[in-house]
């Protein structure tokens, strides 16, 4: 059975032609998150089943994880992008009272009911719930602002570390290995000495091979000129 999106007024179906479109199942293991999904879909008396899915067009880009080749939803992702207006919808606003975006984990959630002025497809007025994420109040009052994050300072407080100071902190290159030498003349001298030593060893090896060949040929000649030396051990073994 082909997959189709469960959102209201959405006709997206699973097709190989649209590979960028993905379908995601409802979070049955998390009841609170499941309620948010069902409210945002905007279908009256809707009960999702185990294989009910919703397409990726109803999620914002920040709801997806940036790791991996597939589109994976984050653990707190909620569908908020819909083409219809007026149904019961739970909208998450990641803005604090000062107008700046805040973190969902650090803020304090408050659910405020609002009566919607629009009508549903069946002609009924329904309430919309808006979830506002607020930051905890500061000691100075509600109007206090959070100071911006300052970079790590160097030895003098109040001054950022300058690029020359950062360069001084970098470790120097060790020079205890032969390949770390920076003097080219020394390397050339070592190379020439090694080549000369290698040539001497080759000559000595060649001379030793010639000596071994001569000794082998002499031994063969002696054994060939005295056949009785090979027969004597055999006679001694028979006696």
Curated annotation (Swiss-Prot):
Record keywords: DNA-binding, Metal-binding, Zinc, Zinc-finger
InterPro entries: THAP3 (IPR026520), THAP_Znf (IPR006612)
Domain of life: Eukaryota
MF annotations from Gene Ontology: DNA binding; zinc ion binding
Zinc finger map (THAP-type): 1-82
Region Disordered: start-end pairs: 88-125, 139-174
Residues spanned by motif HCFC1-binding motif (HBM): 176-179
Record Pfam families: THAP
SUPFAM superfamilies: Glucocorticoid receptor-like (DNA-binding domain) (SSF57716)
Subunit structure: Component of a THAP1/THAP3-HCFC1-OGT complex that contains at least, either THAP1 or THAP3, HCFC1 and OGT. Interacts directly with OGT and HCFC1 (via its HBM).
Described function: Component of a THAP1/THAP3-HCFC1-OGT complex that is required for the regulation of the transcriptional activity of RRM1.
Protein known as: THAP domain-containing protein 3
Native species: Bos taurus
């Amino acid at each position: 059975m082909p997959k189709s999106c469960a959102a209201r007024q959405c006709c997206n179906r699973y097709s190989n032609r649209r590979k960028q479109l993905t379908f995601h199942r409802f979070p049955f293991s998390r009841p609170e998150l499941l309620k948010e999904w069902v409210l945002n879909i905007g279908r009256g008396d809707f009960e999702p089943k185990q294989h009910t899915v919703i397409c990726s067009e109803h999620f914002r880009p920040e709801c997806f994880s940036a790791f991996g080749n597939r589109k994976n939803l984050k653990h707190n992702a909620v569908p908020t992008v819909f083409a219809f207006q007026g149904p019961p919808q739970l909208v998450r606003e990641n803005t604090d009272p000062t107008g700046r975006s805040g973190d969902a984990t650090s803020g304090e959630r408050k659910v405020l009911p609002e009566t919607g002025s629009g009508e549903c497809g069946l002609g009924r007025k329904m309430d919309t719930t808006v979830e506002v994420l607020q930051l905890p109040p500061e000691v100075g009052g509600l109007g206090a602002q959070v100071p911006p994050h300052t970079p790590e300072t160097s030895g003098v407080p109040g001054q950022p570390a300058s690029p020359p100071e950062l360069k001084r902190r970098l470790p120097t290159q060790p020079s205890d290995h032969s390949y770390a030498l920076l003097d080219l003349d020394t390397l050339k001298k070592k190379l020439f000495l090694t080549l000369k030593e290698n040539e001497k060893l080759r000559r000595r090896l060649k001379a030793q091979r010639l000596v071994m060949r001569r000794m082998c040929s002499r031994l063969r000649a002696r054994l060939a000129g005295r056949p009785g030396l090979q027969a004597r051990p055999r006679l001694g073994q028979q006696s």
